[in-house]
Swiss-Prot record:
Listed GO MF terms: structural constituent of ribosome
Family named by the database record: Belongs to the bacterial ribosomal protein bL36 family.
GO biological process: translation
Name of the featured protein: Large ribosomal subunit protein bL36
NCBIfam families: rpmJ_bact
GO cellular component terms attached to this protein's record: cytoplasm; ribonucleoprotein complex; ribosome
Matching PANTHER family: 50S RIBOSOMAL PROTEIN L36, CHLOROPLASTIC, LARGE RIBOSOMAL SUBUNIT PROTEIN BL36C
UniProt entry tagged with the keyword Ribosomal protein: yes
InterPro entries: Ribosomal_bL36, Ribosomal_bL36_sp
Alphabetized UniProt keyword annotations: Ribonucleoprotein, Ribosomal protein
Species lineage: Bacteria, Bacillati, Cyanobacteriota, Cyanophyceae, Synechococcales
SUPFAM superfamilies in the cross-refs: Ribosomal protein L36 (SSF57840)
Length: 37
């Protein structure tokens, strides 16, 4: 899980979602998981 101020899709399988008011990226590739902090 990377914590970034700007979350971006890193590949075409990445999905940008909102959970509990936080913007997150979920993906099939675990290296692409990100959340805004």
């Amino acid at each position: 899980m990377k914590v970034r101020s700007s979350v971006k899709k890193m590949c075409d399988k990445c999905r940008v979602i909102r959970r509990h008011g936080k913007v997150m990226v979920i993906c099939a590739n675990p290296k692409h998981k990100q959340r805004q902090g």
